[in-house]
Amino acid sequence: GDKIKTLSDIQYIPYTEKSDIRDNYPYGLFAQPMKKIVRIHASSGTTGNPTVVGYTRNDLDMWSDCVARLCAAVGVTDDDVAQISFGYGLFTGALGLHYGLEKLGAAVIPVSSGNTEKQVKLLHDFGTTVLISTPSYAMYMSEVAHDMGISNDQLKLRIGLFGSEGCTNELRDKIEKGFGLFSTDNYGMSELCGPGVSGECYLREGLHFAED
């Protein structure tokens, strides 16, 4: 404690690293007993054991608050119909956005991933106004919609909440032209709940970090 006097002294503070999480797989770093854990998510584990995250009821409430703020910052309201085209499961993206959007009051369509023609049909038939997916899948959906003869003026899409992969400005422009919506970026990681860690607001001048 005596060493921490200036900002440069942060080097003396130990960090939790990926290796710590893997070495304590699956539950070794949980800070609460299992009777307090109400949900478990995990990363894909492509480079080793997956990162396992346990959530208490309070964690889920805080997480949905962060996601709701992220969505509100880009203009989502309780009048919106939000279609989630992330895969549901251990991946945090789908359920993270799902409960945040519900807390905001939006109507959520939990379509999950795949079956793109059906996805596009639901965009049209259900009057979806907010699309949640990876940017590359949004681009593909817009191409399928075009092939199906569905034009932008037949859809009600207005906002895209895209994440889980990088998105260049060129791809963003293509998505916006392809679907006629306002494209936004957000970021999350399993170690910090999931989506809701940071995201753009309607000004799109960088990601706002949720300090809480």
Where are each of the predicted segments found?
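Hydrophobic/aromatic beta-strand patches that form the interior of the parallel beta-sheet core
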Residues: 5, 14-17, 83, 109, ...
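Glycine-rich helix-loop-beta junction characteristic of Rossmann-like nucleotide cofactor-binding loops
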Residues: 72-76, 100, 151-152
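Helix N-cap/coil-helix junction residues
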Residues: 2-3, 76, 150, 181
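Active-site glycine/GP-rich loop and adjacent strand/helix microenvironment
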Residues: 104-212
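AMP-binding/adenylate-forming
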Residues: 56-70, 81-140
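Gly/Ser/Thr-rich beta-alpha loop segments that engage phosphate groups in nucleotides
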Residues: 47-50, 89, 190
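Nucleotide 5′-phosphate-binding alpha/beta core
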Residues: 1-42, 48-65, 69-73, 79
